[in-house]
Amino acid sequence: MLNWNEEHTELCKSMSKNWLSFRPFEENPKGLMLISTDIIQKFKDCGFSIETITNPQASYRPIIIARKEVNGARNTVGFFGHYDVEPVVKINQWSSDPWELVDKDNRWFGRGLADNLVPLAQRLILFDQITSLPLNLIYVLQGEEEIGSPFALEMYPKIDLPKVDLWIEETGYFYKDGRQRIMLFNRNIMIEKILDGIIEMNNVDDRGYTIRERPLNKAFGAEHCPCLLHLVGDTPYLAIGPNDDFSTIHGVNESISPKLLPVCTSQYELIFKELST
């Protein structure tokens, strides 16, 4: 159903490079406007309908709600994340221009690639491959996560969404030794089946894993994340994606490993199949 090859890796790299060139951080409103416009169009190209919620004081970074509803689908997978990135403070300490994607030593370097431009780009590429799968998809994105999500905290409780059967975090995590850190909570039979499948995949690939019943770390704390506060509730939650110990999110020489993209693709396929049956 899902495929990931070198062509997909290059497309992901190109998309991420383009977004990075916009410099989409709060002090550059034009960059946030450019990236939000491009993301909206890419969702539309994948067959999603779009709703935006605009802050009158910051119209350049709307909340984006992308929906794809399929006749006959019984389940809905929800995703959440953000399209803004952290500004660069210690630019002189970077080994390359943080606003240009640099491919070096099997990693892509650039501000925001791990948090979370590349994970978002990969998902859009995979969504484009899903044409007839009986599964509803929802993606909620904000453009102010790096400044504490003030408008999202106000608006997310008011968003009218259908019942979501599984919420997937903006990304996941792998350790330096290659082990995957699988983060989840609100466990039920469905997520146990998914977990068993991910564990089996890791065993086949001789990859270790650690299970943590908690959400992904948040810069402002989980108690201040609008997604965890107002979207997830008691719905099963899972964090998977290509970030790792070398990503140095918010730090100097932020990077991501493209070699983890095929691994994540297989796990997304497992999830989509489980919820479309």
Enumerate the language-model features and the residues they cover.
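Fold-independent oxyanion-binding glycine-rich loops
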Residues: 53, 81-83, 143-144, 170-172, ...
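Catalytic-loop motifs flanking and including active-site residues across diverse enzymes
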Residues: 115-122, 190, 224-228, 264
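N-terminal helical capping/dimerization or prosegment-like subdomains
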Residues: 1-91, 256-263, 269, 274
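An extended, acidic, His-containing surface patch that forms the Zn2+-binding/catalytic region
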Residues: 72, 176-177, 194-277
